[in-house]
Structure formats: structure tokens, C-alpha cells
Amino acid sequence: MSQTSPLSEQADSSLKYDYSNVPAQALDAIRMRLAQLTHSLSKIRDDMSKADLPQWYSLQAQLSVTLTQLSSLTSTLQHFEDTLECTVPYPLPSFPTTAHEGLLTTLMRKKQIPEVENWIKDAIDHSGLDLEGRNWDEIESAIQRDKSTTARALDFINQEYSNYSFQGLYTAEELSKNVGDPQSMIYRSATSNAKPKAPFSVDSILTFMYQGTMKTEETSIAK
């Protein structure tokens, strides 16, 4: 087994590295988001690989959490985009290259893995942008126009969604104008003014059990 010479150990101990420019906040925030997303995806994979599949509501809740974590990771990456683009990782002399050779290779890798290359190529093909015939300003302007169109479409969908009750065949505006039969279960909405009937009282139930007659308000008044 090879041993480190005392001279090299003394040289390493005498070196003082400056960590002030290391983007620790950005890296730690991204690490936490990636750890949460990895844990959620692993749990979904384990649940789906079991013989008994999880209940639909449990799977829906897990997917909702995963989508939220993915959105949070995307926002974090966009927030620290400038910092990550100008950050260049490199190993220190004390880095355990033998034990973490795979991690070192990943950090020093300049080319994307095949899965990422296919994902980027698919996104470029669907965007319809000609990257070779345009400069970066034109591409950035096209991306901003696409984001603006997406935002307007989302606002329109939310506005149209608010115009419908999704509990019947009438819109929210028609229900507010008392159009249709509010008593019908088909057209009843959450804002219907129809009131449910009062439940039977204990006295009415006991009277019906022992006398066979239903005690109502009219009979009680007549008596």
C-alpha cells in the first residue's frame, strides 16, 4: 500500500484555501431540493413496484407533492442561474479520488449525459427555434414572448374556470341570475338558496313507532 510522504502531508497542511467565493448558499439550497425530490421519486417507484398498488388518492397525493418539489427545484435553479453558470468545480489535493472517483468524474464532466442531451434536443425541436440562424438576443426575446403567451393563456383558463360551477349544466353567471330550477339536483350549485328539510324529531319517530301516525305541525295545531 502506498503511503503519503511526510513532506506532502506538511505541504497540504500548510496550504490555506479561500472558501469565501464558494456559493455555499446556492449549492446547499439545490442539494436540499434535489434530496427531497429524489426521496419522493424513490418512494413512488417503490410503491409502484409492489404487488399491491397503492390507493389512487395516496398516489395522487404523492404526485402532487412531487410536482410541488419539482417546481421548487426549478425556481431555485432559475434563482441561482447566474451563480451556477460562472461556477467552476475543481478538486482540492485532499479530495479522496480513489473512494469518490465516480463523483469526481461527474463534477469534472463537461458534456451532458445522453439522457440530458435527448431532453435538450427534444425541447429545442418542439420550440421551433433556429439556434444556428439567430443570435442570443433573438432567442431570449422569443422565449420571453412564449412565456408571455403562456401567462395570458393561463389567466384566460382561470377566468373561464371561475365562470362555471362544475356542479351542473348552468354557468355561475346564470345561477346568480336564478336561471333554471335550483331545486333540481342536476342544476343545484353550491350557491343555491334551496334549504334542506328539517329532520324528524325524536317525538315524531316514537309516535310513529307506537301509534302508526306521523306527528306533523298541522295535526299538532289542530289539536
From Swiss-Prot:
UniProt cross-references to Pfam families, sorted A to Z: Med8
Localisation: Nucleus
A GO MF label: transcription corepressor activity
Top-level taxon of the source organism: Eukaryota
Keywords attached to this entry: Activator, Nucleus, Transcription, Transcription regulation
GO biological process: negative regulation of transcription by RNA polymerase II; positive regulation of transcription elongation by RNA polymerase II; positive regulation of transcription initiation by RNA polymerase II; regulation of transcription by RNA polymerase II; RNA polymerase II preinitiation complex assembly
Cellular component per GO, a single term: core mediator complex
Signal peptide stretch: none
Quaternary structure note: Component of the Mediator complex.
Family: Belongs to the Mediator complex subunit 8 family.
Annotated function: Component of the Mediator complex, a coactivator involved in the regulated transcription of nearly all RNA polymerase II-dependent genes. Mediator functions as a bridge to convey information from gene-specific regulatory proteins to the basal RNA polymerase II transcription machinery. Mediator is recruited to promoters by direct interactions with regulatory proteins and serves as a scaffold for the assembly of a functional preinitiation complex with RNA polymerase II and the general transcription factors.
Protein name according to UniProt: Mediator of RNA polymerase II transcription subunit 8
Organism this protein belongs to: Eremothecium gossypii (strain ATCC 10895 / CBS 109.51 / FGSC 9923 / NRRL Y-1056)
Lineage: Eukaryota, Fungi, Dikarya, Ascomycota, Saccharomycotina
